[in-house]
Structures are given as C-alpha cells and as structure tokens.
Amino acid sequence: MFDKLVVIDAKGHLLGRLASYVAKELLSGQRIVVVRTEAINISGSLFRNRVKFSEFLNKWMNHNPRRGVQHFRAPSRIFWRAVRGMLPHKTPKGAAALERLKIFEGIPTPYDRVKKQVVVDALKVQRLRNSRPVCKLGDLSASVGWGKQTLIEKLEEKRRARAKTYHDKKVKQADARKKELAAPALKAIKDKLAQFGY
C-alpha cells in the first residue's frame, strides 16, 4: 500500500480478517487509522459471543488481578487487542508497528473529511453466507459493560447530517455549473473555439 496514511472504515468487516490485514500492513511500515470499530461484524450470534467473552472475563492473575489480563470492553480496544495478538509486540519491531495504529469508535473530526478505504477480502458479504448468524462488535461491547454506545450513535447521526448537507451543496454546485456550460451565450463561444480545435 505505502501511502502516507491509510484510513479504513471498519463497518461490515469481519474482526479477525481485518485485524490480520492491518497487522501485516503495520509490519511493512504503513500508518493505519481504523474508524467505526463499533460496526465490525463477528461471526456467530450475540449469545454465543457473549458466552465466549464471559469465559475470557474469568481469566485473571490470582495473587494480583491488577497485574493480570486486561479485559477491554470498548470495541476499539477489543480490535486493538486482536491486532496486538497478530504482532510480535514484545520485540522492538512489533512495538513500533503497534504505535503506527490508531483506532476509533465512530469517525472523529480529522478523519471525517478524509477518503476512507475498505478491505475487500475482509468484508462480511465476501466471506460469509447470508444465512450465517453475525453480531456487531458494538452490541457485544455494550452487553459486557461498554457504556458509550448511545453517545457514539448520537455523534454518528450528527456527522451523517453534516455530510448530507455538504453533499447536497456539492450536487447543487455541480448542477449550476452544468447549466452555465449549457447556456446559449456560451454556445457561440464554444463553436468558435471548436473551429480552432479546442
């Protein structure tokens, strides 16, 4: 890839497949930002994934739980942990790769105006049958203690409203330009220029 910065919209991607792609790109030196992690898909029903996550919550260090397994609840941190598991994060190379990654719920201000990409090989529609049960990472996080889901949804609604007004304005400008170019006053000038090969 090797762009200055790659912004990936994680909506509709599968958790593990997207994490493996991101990990590989990070190791090659690419800087990556992943947005909308609350909309990542996990194969399997919400109930099944909650059972698996509750088993993970049971893991801790007996004599000092604060030093043991960190049980992240936010979707961004769950995805970060999945990527970390695919990197040699205890070596300098892996630690440097992990520092090149930024992950967010929703789309915060600097990245809402940046062109975003998708990873086609990691999309749910490419990899799973329609009949397969899936759940969203945001729903799983909210069911195990993440308390920011409603806030993120409100902020996303506001962002979508801003994006719609911006898009409508651009469409209106494009239509006005088309009308100007099709005006009869310009037709005579265009015909004159066409004689000279323009």
From Swiss-Prot:
Keywords: Ribonucleoprotein, Ribosomal protein. One of its GO terms (molecular function) is mRNA binding. InterPro entries: Ribosomal_uL13 (IPR005822), Ribosomal_uL13_CS (IPR023563), Ribosomal_uL13_euk/arc (IPR005755), Ribosomal_uL13_sf (IPR036899). CDD domains: Ribosomal_L13. Signal peptide: none annotated. One of its GO terms (cellular component) is cytosolic large ribosomal subunit. One of its GO terms (biological process) is translation. It comes from the Eukaryota. The keyword Ribonucleoprotein applies. Belongs to the universal ribosomal protein uL13 family. This is Large ribosomal subunit protein uL13. It comes from Tetrahymena thermophila (strain SB210).
